[in-house]
Amino acid sequence: LQADHRSVVRSSFRNAGFARVSNISDRQFTFDNQATDIDDIFIFENVIVLIEYTCAQSSGVGEHLKNKKHIFDKILADPVQFLTFLENRFSGITEQLATGYHPQQKIVRIVYCSRHDFDEKYKANVPGPVYMDYPAVRYFAAVSDAVRRSSRHELLHFLNVDNTAVGSAGKITVSTSSNEYSGSLLPEAHSHFDNGFKIVTFYADPEALLRSAYVLRKDGWRDSLNLYQRMISRAKVEGIRAYLKKQKRVFINNIIVTLPPDVRPLNSKHETIDSSTLTQTAAVKIKLPDRPNSIGIIDGQHRVFAYHETADDDSEIALLRVQQNLLVTGIIYPQHLSNIEREKFEARLFLEINSTQTNAKSQLKQAIGLVLEPFASESIAARVLSQLARSGPLQGVVEQHFFDTNTLKTSSIVSF
């Protein structure tokens, strides 16, 4: 069990492009009068991730965390001193640690990976680490297996690492960049969306979308009940990738996305255009910030991530990633719209798109119902059942995660 747990976590970091420091795992040392060890260290550029594994049963995790709290606090209180200590203590580690960066530019994160669920109060008592609970472990294993190095942006987001602080080849870029695309803006009278919604269409290269995109997947790590998108499928990604290599052409159907609030449709003078004053479609410039996790994909995640980067990058795909352009329809929300209203809008749109292809599965409809009609009988039943499965008498009996086997499906029970 322990070996399998470590293997799954290691594969996620390796697939994302992190390098494992090989000669320090499980070796005892004393730092600041505290005897301890580190289970694993992974590095990407100036980001250093210290990983602590445990396969203790739920009842024993609290004690394990309590024993680790002191060393976690000491490391996070002075990460520069700790990294200097490691370089002096373990010969050969200097070459594996981030080179070319000032010590103050190095970012240290401690990740605590428990194989079993445990009480949330222990996390509150030991707030230092990033907690990669087992569902998150399996989630990143699946995502990184499907999209390899292109999973790195989401993993860094999970680690609460600001991407602007992450270096490249020993350098950290201070200025912010953006990509400008030619597109068209639909008048509000022609879209029939509510007032203030802007609909723009433009062509964007897959590389830019891969750097900027995120997907709110139902089985992901984000702490929200209002998630409904399916897990990414490696088989589907590989199928589209094979098509791209064989046909050398893009899919012509739209990628549907939400754009960050600072995006504005601009005219030739780079002035913001008011779509409410338009009587016909207008040519515009769309300036997208080159910022990870800023463009939300509502429909088309497999078509975008089929261009993903790998360790030994496929030369054909690498070329198509920058040469080809995907047709993108972007939605810019009104400034005053709340997060709840945005989630409802996206859920309704997602259901409309997917229910026209085939009959949407009851599981999908129920997940979207939680967003659109939270007080409907099915939504209440689904939430109650989920809570009972998480920490009640139905724990281990009802399916909670995409990787659960030999369990009853929530959608079947709720429908019944």
Where in the sequence are the language-model features?
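N-terminal leader or domain-start segments enriched in small/polar residues
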Residues: E95-A98, H102, I107-V111, R115-N293, ...
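Solvent-exposed functional surfaces
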Residues: D37, D312-F416
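Amphipathic alpha-helical segments that form well-ordered structural scaffolds
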Residues: V8, S12, G239, Y243, ...
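Intrinsically disordered, low-complexity Ser/Thr/Pro/Gly-rich regulatory segments
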Residues: L1-T173
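"Short basic amphipathic alpha-helical interaction patches in structured regions
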Residues: H64-H70, H270-T272, H308-D314, A347
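A sequence-level detector for short glycine-anchored, His/Arg-bearing signature motifs
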Residues: I286-D313
